[in-house]
From Swiss-Prot:
Residues 391-400 have a biased composition (Polar residues). The keyword Transferase applies. One of its GO terms (molecular function) is protein serine kinase activity. This is Sperm motility kinase Tcr mutant form. Its EC number is 2.7.11.1. The gene is Smoktcr. ATP binds at residues 14-22, 37. It catalyses: L-seryl-[protein] + ATP = O-phospho-L-seryl-[protein] + ADP + H(+); L-threonyl-[protein] + ATP = O-phospho-L-threonyl-[protein] + ADP + H(+). InterPro entries: Kinase-like_dom_sf, Prot_kinase_dom, Tyr_kinase_AS.
Length: 484
């Protein structure tokens, strides 16, 4: 318990199951929100609990929820997973009424890609329902809750009754041995029908009524749907499991292949096997060992180190996607920007002017550099293993904010602030600083959780290239800015 709460702050309940709760939590080190499935051991079988964790450890697909860390105590198991910023498919359809075919197709393609990946790994979900599918704001689909999932061999039949009634297959309702992969195919049919009609085909909590509906109604598909879609739904929801297609066969159905959309790439790597050097270096400043970072990712240990790396990387990418609000400028005065001197850069990345050029401003203008005394304008550029790059687009305006972004490997850039009091008006527009002004080395990092959080925040801001650090590391250094 203490191990979990030392790393995460529990916030609120966002989901409830038979023997588990899903909580919203905050990772103390990065401030990133995560979803935590809390499973009480005494309230359910332990083997299925670990089975869900083991299944998620085997998966790495853009349309399957990512497991980041597993923390086990004497009484509970904590599954720390990425937080989906969106709604369940059920809520999404409830708000929309139902989806047009062109709207449903890209969502269904993502589901097919995820389930085909699972079946190729020998994993079956067995609980594909609109509540277990998340739709994020950008339209990406995520399959969640592998609590009823398991691993099987091709041709292996089961007779364990473990499904929710409205989505149960005929073979399960009539207590027949079943192929678990065909259970998922039926689930895909139920989900597709719900997307294009806004209704659950067989909606009852009674087993007897459900049996009668399946036998009597078969599968009534609205005539307003296209012929291809009607055919696909009937194939998916065939009451004879042997006649149901495999997921791979569904992926080449004419309705699925219509249009130019492509299926998600299952080889897309969400948990890298090798750490990014810049992120690893930032983590080194807060106590993580480089070898431990590499081993945790390569061996997929799902420990504190692996979770911290993945959440830090996610936070960096999220911050770099945000536009930066600049202060109003006087169009008659050219802004003077410069790169901070290497000795004051917290990540310890030192570059000299003799190294190969790798970062230039897009307007190709010379930029005065603040540092030692100089009477010439210089242009400095940096090179290095860039991780994050952003386009630059600057338009100085008066009394109006604008967006400024950087181009190139931006983790090595930082801009110093200039004050009007230090401009030397006797020079010909050149700026210099006193040689006696020496940068003061940054003070030691604060102790405790808050100190660690501030440290990782400062490191992330530097990696995000344009967000200023909250920590003051230039004490005693004079700064110069243009006189307006």
């Amino acid at each position: 318990m203490e191990k979990f709460h030392a790393q995460y702050e529990m916030l609120e309940t966002i989901g409830q199951g038979g023997c588990a709760q899903v909580k919203l939590a905050r990772h103390r080190l990065t401030g990133t929100h995560v979803a935590v499935k809390v499973i009480v051991k005494r309230e359910c079988w332990f083997n299925p609990v670990m089975s869900e964790a083991e299944l998620l450890m085997m998966t790495d697909h853009p349309n399957i929820i990512s497991l980041l860390q597993v923390i086990e105590t004497k009484k509970k198991v904590y599954l720390i997973m990425e937080l989906c910023e969106g709604k369940s498919l059920y809520q999404h359809i409830q708000n929309a009424g139902y989806l047009q075919e062109d709207e449903a197709r890209p969502l269904f393609k993502q589901l097919l890609s995820a389930m085909n990946y699972c079946h190729n790994q020998g994993i079956v979900h067995r609980d594909l329902t609109p509540d277990n599918i998340m739709v994020e704001k950008d339209g990406k689909v995520k399959i969640i809750d592998f609590g009823l999932g398991t691993q099987e061999k091709p041709g292996q039949n089961h007779n364990l009754f473990c499904e929710i009634y409205p989505f149960s297959t005929p073979e399960v309702l009539f207590n027949r041995p079943y192929d678990m992969r065909k259970i998922d195919v039926w689930g895909l049919g139920v989900v597709l029908y719900f997307m294009v009609t806004g209704k659950i085909l067989f909606d009852t909590a009674s087993v007897e009524k459900l049996r009668k509906q399946i036998v009597a109604e078969k599968c009534s598909v609205p005539c307003r749907l296209s012929v291809e879609l009607q055919d696909l739904i009937r194939l998916l929801m065939t009451d004879i499991p042997e006649l149901r297609p495999t997921v791979a066969e569904v992926m080449v159905h004419p309705w699925v292949t219509e249009g130019s959309g492509v299926l998600p790439d299952p080889c897309e790597e969400h948990i890298p096997l090798k750490p990014d050097p810049a992120i690893a270096k930032a983590m080194g400043f807060i106590g993580f060992q480089a070898q431990d970072i590499e081993d945790s990712l390569c061996q997929r240990k799902f420990n504190e180190t692996m979770a911290s790396y993945c959440l830090l990387k996610k936070q960096i990418l999220k911050e770099c996607d945000r536009p930066i609000r600049a202060q109003p400028m006087n169009p008659s005065v050219t802004p003077l920007s410069s790169l901070v001197d290497a000795p004051t850069f917290h990540l310890g990345l030192r570059r000299t002017e003799t190294e190969p050029t790798g970062l230039r401003l897009s307007d190709n203008k010379e930029v005065p550099v603040c540092g030692n005394s100089t009477s010439k304008k210089r242009e400095r550029s940096f090179s290095g293993p860039g991780v994050l790059s952003r386009p630059i687009n600057t338009t100085p305006t008066m009394d109006q904010t604008h967006t400024r972004t950087w181009s190139g490997p931006c983790i090595y850039s930082n801009v110093c602030t200039i004050h009007p009091n230090s401009i030397n008006e006797s020079t010909e527009g050149h700026i210099s600083t006193s040689a006696e002004d020496k940068p003061v080395h940054s003070r030691g990092w604060p102790r405790g959780i808050k100190g660690w959080t501030r440290k990782i925040g400062n490191a992330m801001r530097k990696l995000c290239c344009c967000i200023p650090s909250k920590e003051t590391s230039h004490l005693g250094q004079r700064r110069v800015c243009p006189k307006i």
